[in-house]
């Protein structure tokens, strides 16, 4: 230890062993989140959980309302180019705490976005392991004997960075969200649209969290909410969100938006086949602006706008 070095470092440097020593997919995994006080988490970020604070160094790699962060940082600090390279949806879903860290020297894993042997925040690659975005009930109790072969998510990051969850639903606070971590979409550009078909190997994901801060713990293992899902075409949804965003700024989305989805292992948007709802057509999101997907007709636009207006007025 160097002279003058603080002995009470919050994140002490650890020696990272070789990956092969503990790379056992069937090993029993203990839950790092089983001891989290849910009451304190629900007040986050105003009353943050001491456990979640241990991951504070990773917050810069996790999603939030970038619009608010940009305005807050305009007074002085500029975002690091290194951090910007880690802020894409592709990296967060398929690389964050999944790709093995290539650094040879010992370092603090709580400050590194890559995976290390035995660390608590490690994630399974959803492209290789078929598990859903639903929290594992056994893991929430403390451990899961199935380990990496489990069909459910283990921990906060596996749940909320799962491709079927991450930014597939709008944040109820919209652009007014000021939470340090938020896995929901704050603008239509952030919203990830998934095909409306269910993959039985991956299961379903539940609706919008009951509390905006409840996303900081693993979602409970419970059936989806009873409120009926909105079922217009995806193009109508995007266009309606644009209208609400232009009219109300940071509008509040009061009702959960759920859908059974098939997990595409890419953050790029893919063609959506016609489903059981009327007035839905195939379209390519990558080739045309979202506003062009709305079918023409004053009645359809008026109906969609009135529906969203009624739902938001109830909140």
UniProtKB/Swiss-Prot annotation:
A GO cellular component term found in this entry reads:
cytoplasm
Entry's Gene Ontology molecular function annotations = DNA binding; DNA-binding transcription factor activity; RNA binding; single-stranded RNA binding; zinc ion binding
In which domain of life is the source organism classified?
Eukaryota
- Presence of the UniProt keyword Protein biosynthesis in the record: no
Please list where the region (Disordered) is annotated. 1-21
Question: InterPro entries of this UniProt entry?
Answer: Unkempt-like, Znf-CCCH_4, Znf_CCCH
Where does the sequence pass through the membrane? Answer: none
Q: Which UniProt keywords apply?
A: DNA-binding, Metal-binding, Repeat, Zinc, Zinc-finger
GO BP of this protein: mRNA destabilization; regulation of DNA-templated transcription
What PROSITE patterns does the record point to?
ZF_C3H1 (PS50103)
Tell me one Pfam family matched here: zf-CCCH_4
Q: Which intervals hold the zinc fingers (C3H1-type)?
A: 131-157, 165-189
The UniProt entry, under PANTHER family, shows:
UNKEMPT FAMILY MEMBER, ZINC FINGER CCCH DOMAIN-CONTAINING PROTEIN 23
Q: Return the protein name.
A: Zinc finger CCCH domain-containing protein 23
